[in-house]
Design a protein with these regions (language model features):
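A conserved regulatory-domain signal marking ACT and ACT-like small-molecule sensing domains
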Residues: 1-132
Length: 132
């Protein structure tokens, strides 16, 4: 069964350039912060980052030293079985309630679970529905 919880995600945008991901991850590493999930992409020469970490305060401070201004956003983290159809079950619960999914990113591995991060039009309601 999927388990959902509210998280505070850090996000920021910067002009894209070679080596930016390495700089960001080195800065976070220097603060001894673990990155739990990460989505990064380029659009129109800008780099967009969304990440969840084990210490937002430490990560924000480390990134500020690099001149990066971050913002915190509420997101839904969902841990689910790494099996065929699990994401469909979760997304159907959200859709059936009329909740819009603004974006999703996730990770799977060879283990028994995967994690997806959602931003929805009603995170609180989505968490309740997923945890039923």
């Amino acid at each position: 069964m999927a388990k959902a919880k509210k998280l505070k995600q850090l996000s920021f945008t910067m002009p894209n350039r070679a080596g930016l991901l390495s700089e960001v991850t080195a800065g976070v590493l220097g603060a001894k912060v673990n990155i739990n999930t990460l989505c990064a992409y380029e659009l129109e020469n800008n780099a967009y980052f969304m990440l969840t970490v084990d210490s937002n305060a430490k990560a924000k401070k480390a990134l500020a030293k690099l001149g990066i201004e971050t913002k915190e956003e509420d997101v839904v983290a969902v841990e689910m079985s790494n099996r065929v159809g699990e994401l469909e079950k979760v997304s159907k619960k959200i859709a059936d309630a009329g909740i819009n999914i603004n974006y999703i990113y996730g990770t799977t591995g060879t283990g028994k679970s995967s994690i997806c991060v959602f931003k929805t039009s009603d995170n609180t309601k989505a968490i309740i529905l997923i945890n039923k």
